Amino acid sequence: IVVSPLIALMKNQVDVINGYSEDDSVAHYLNSSLNRAAINRVESDVKSGKTKLLYVAPESLNKEDNLPFFQSFKISFIAVDEAHCISEWGHDFRPEYRNIKPTLEKIAVARNVRHIPVIALTATATDKVRIDIKTNLGMPDPKEFKSSFNRPNLYYEVRQKVSDEDTDSQSIKFIKSHEGRGGISYCRSRKEVEELAKKLTLNGFRAAPYHAGLDNEVRAKTQDDFLKENIDIIVATIAFGMGIDKPDVRFVIHYDIPKSLEGYYQETGSAGRDGGAGICLAFYSPKDLKKLSKFMDTKSEMEKEIGRQLLDETKAYAETSVCRRKVLLNYFGEAYTKDNCGNCDNCKRPKKYIEATDALECVLSAIKALKGQYEQNYVVDFVRGRATDHIVRDGNDKLPEFGNGKEINNDIASIWNPVIRQGMIAGYIRKDIKHCGLLKITSSGKEWLKEPRPFSVVPDREFVDSDDGGEGGTSALDLPLYQQLKGLRHDVAKKHNIPPCVIFQ
């Protein structure tokens, strides 16, 4: 059994699997889109042994009425796809995922077995999310298989969002420089999706909207048109998610910076799956994060705290001048040893490093004095000597290290956040993932304090409008020949009713 939240994708997955068999019942799916007759057929094929692979939505697995069915046949193992959905620290938390473990326990009891083997899969799990997955699925000591998060063929760029009109203009210019290439543009709201899709259509692009407010048939047709290259661009909300497997998506644009780096990584991951170049362009404004922060006002304190930390990480990524690949991989707990990846805006247009040895010493001394009990903003206020209510209430304004960074040159007064972030990348500081991002000094940090060595940082980025269309344009192509080949590929694909990317890349 494969547990998956991607209802829109299930039919496609099952069709592909059945395509390898002469029997169209070797794979089935079970979710809320099926009528009673279809459900009866699925249950019959499963019980008779014809079906070897069953995709189910978590809601269908956990539904009380379905329990006798799942208890009536032998299950060799359960594959939990998109397993990050089980964690409140994940970017796409689904409460129904928390009920998978109790349901499996009920099935195991009825089948008179100790447990049902479980494999959990995700492309976007931080250390905290991995711990949550193991805890909530009852996997105390599982074997873990972790591949690299690095996608070397993807180019990452963040541009300043000055206004909606300017963002539209930059996006249209960018897409024109990649005309005929498949791409996805993400917007935060349905209204923005509809408006942008219309603007792109008016500018001569083959684009279509995709969001949860559209009928299932409309969304299915849009997906199909995108696969068959009847349209080049899908403008979507996060409802699109990972709902399509098109290997030759050449660019992903974010009109609004996502609310978490997991969401950003997963959505940009649609680009360049065939190994070819993919461009990931995001537009960023601090105002967008303030709006997202306001949306959390109605949530519980725990949800607000988690949401705030996720936004802080997104802000750090957007504003950094360090290699974006290094920052992104570090967030997922993976070291990237190169200083320049050569394939992000910061590495293409690097800023100068500035001396920050004294600043790092101030920060590490402060974290040590505070016994690793406080998060980043608190530490920055402490180092700067800001007697906030929180610091005074804790009595930490009396510590000798309080304000130890006051003497740092005013020209680099904004250096503290870059020092902390880049100190984490260097391995001197770590965030306590179990306790709301408290800053801790590592053993390497303690050694550095004993014998300080030169340390420099890149100040955070000042946003400037980019005057080009990003990397990977079509200037080196023979465009007439490219269009002829593309047309030929489309005709052959249409004749055989298969996606064009299957013919050739």
What are the functions of these language-model segments?
Residues 114, 321, 372:
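Flexible coil/turn residues that form the inter-helical turn or adjacent wing/linker of helix-turn-helix
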Residues 1-6:
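Walker A/P-loop
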Residues 153, 248, 291-295, 310-314, ...:
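A general alpha-helix detector
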Residues 303-335:
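Short, charged low-complexity linear segments at domain edges
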Residues 175, 226, 318, 367-371:
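Short helix-to-turn junction characteristic of helix-turn-helix DNA-binding domains
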Residues 8-302, 306-309, 333-338, 345-346:
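Helicase motor core with emphasis on the C-terminal RecA-like subdomain
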Residues 307, 337-505:
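Accessory DNA-binding and partner-docking regions appended to nucleic-acid-acting proteins
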